[in-house]
Amino acid sequence: MVSVTEQNLDVTDGYDGPMLEVNNLKMHFPVTSGVIFQKKVADVKAVDGITFQIKKGETLGLVGESGCGKTTTGRCILQLYSPTSGQIKFNGRDLTDISKKDMRAMRREMQVIFQDPYGSLNPRMTCGDIVGEPLKVHKLTSGKGEY
């Protein structure tokens, strides 16, 4: 059971397995034909059977050529896309069968940096401000000195 409150943020609840498990993840997007009567003619297999684990304390860099499914994989893990099939577990909890409210709380514990980090940085902010902003938004820090 996952317990998330403002005072007590405990998403692991004693779990000591892999932090993130992705098993046979697939995300297929339909290709349609026709203007009025759209008919599915094919699927684009953006992600087709990816499997990996990340243990606590590890960092994973998903690297590949443009259009190979890196961003789609991250969006599926965060449940911004509903995968076609597969299983995603975060600290032992299946994310493919979780309420939107619980998923919002789980996202506080996840971080995905999408493709071009330099394009996503605000030149008017310091690195500390950029890193600290999500901590402040999710109320995980009380002030600037903590990050």
Model-assigned labels for residue ranges:
Residues 1-147:
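ABC transporter nucleotide-binding domains
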